[in-house]
């Protein structure tokens, strides 16, 4: 291994040696503790330490890194105390994630490390978002994302690199190519000669280096960082290396030929570097033994400290639930905003109001929020000059420019990941899904990254995803789905679904102000068919509060979205029945108090929604009412929903599919029970 030709000072060489030595010695200690039965599992990175150490030491301490589960050297070289790291690995309350995350999945804002999720690929787009924040603020920084050669097979790898290239983002993508994805060899993973060859396809530069040579890693990253900042472009670095242990200790290494171990043992990144330092008289044997003694004492002391203070976690359920969402209040916003609870009397208020369509109310909410929040970025396919598929964002790019109103490539997953990266740097994002149906392409980012990150390590995800949804417009099975129930079932997300123009504006402003991830559903059929009196100035309607549109005595219809208009239309034609119509407005969290109040007024409940019947939110509401309001009921809670089929294209088939076609039948059954 050639360590020559690098212009390093003695101090730098010692720092790099110590940077690779400490994680190796910690790993060896962990393997000993594993054999002793004092810890239960370990994911080893022995043989790959030069990459983590070299990359981290080449960066400034306030540049974000997105590491994986073998990058111990990232954490040690960022100065995380070992006793707290060990507590994290042991699932202790006073680790970095209160016992909620295993091993290296946690993050820490203090050290500019964003923890991974097990899916690997989604990690990379978060670096895009961080780099976009750097670019917008004109900061001379880079973001770094790690992945393995296995992770490059995921679509998220393609999406992250493509977005970084198209937008000119200063991201360094580091691929640790250790030859095996768990046990799958590279010849079963990809067919190109080298992963770095893919860089050309994205119009970016790339380089393949010896990942076991810490000087090569450090020197390369230093140079690449300079290039990324100066050129405002991404870079792909493929580091060739080898993992000397199994995927985790229980899985073993039988799948690796013995001769490979023989070859790579001669390339051990610590031993070869140590040998060169001694040979070149950069360090003495005494220096090396002194460093090892220092680290051994440090490791033993820190681990015993962690063991001595380890206590069994006593779960406090209310704390677990409370940490799912970030807390907030009006004090967190930059302006004093009206909070409107009673939209029925809005015309009698002191606010100046005008008649607006549903679509225009949403546009105004975004426009006013962008004025108030100069850190708000709007992203989506065709949303800039074209104004979006439904023209919601029309004109915004003329006012705020293309830096803040950004057309995206067709890559939903990467854009959601980018939004999370922006959130790490204090930005807000509004993403437009062209159709709610297309959100499936970003599902992992939403339900595993956005939804879980605050519970995991206290980082909020300040992201609103706008979801044009619903049928009734003859758009067929892939442009008409009602998929809100998918997200209601996911802790950590808020789900909002307005039915009127005044609520669309107020709820969207509230969603943008909220530091938590919000799925904001907008029924396409309401965009230009529904209008109402809407205040000119910004205002919020509280998330999590339902609205009783009509009070009645005979039957409660609990609904939302287009269902509100179906219910009102039906009630208007059947004046002999007294209807209590409750517009939920927010599906997560639900307003259980309002639901119970409606039940108490009538004793008969129909839950109406456009979503299909089985597994819809109506089942959840019905179950809650049966559990908590059973004595108030005069009949079973009934559901009226769309057919359990895909949404058909033909207009007559679509009418038959929709819940509205069965509304009269359901109401009559309930009244006659």
Model region roles, listed by residue range:
Residues 41-48, 69-70, 106-124, 148, ...:
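Active-site nucleophile and cofactor-binding loops and adjacent substrate-binding regions
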Residues 1-51, 245, 249-400, 625, ...:
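Conserved acidic/glycine
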Residues 76-80, 155-159, 183-188, 219, ...:
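Short acidic, glycine/serine/threonine-rich loops at helix termini
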Residues 112-308, 488-603, 607-608:
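Glycine-rich ThDP/TPP pyrophosphate-binding loop and its adjacent helix/strand module
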Residues 53-61, 128-139, 161-169, 200-201, ...:
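Alpha-helix C-terminal capping segments
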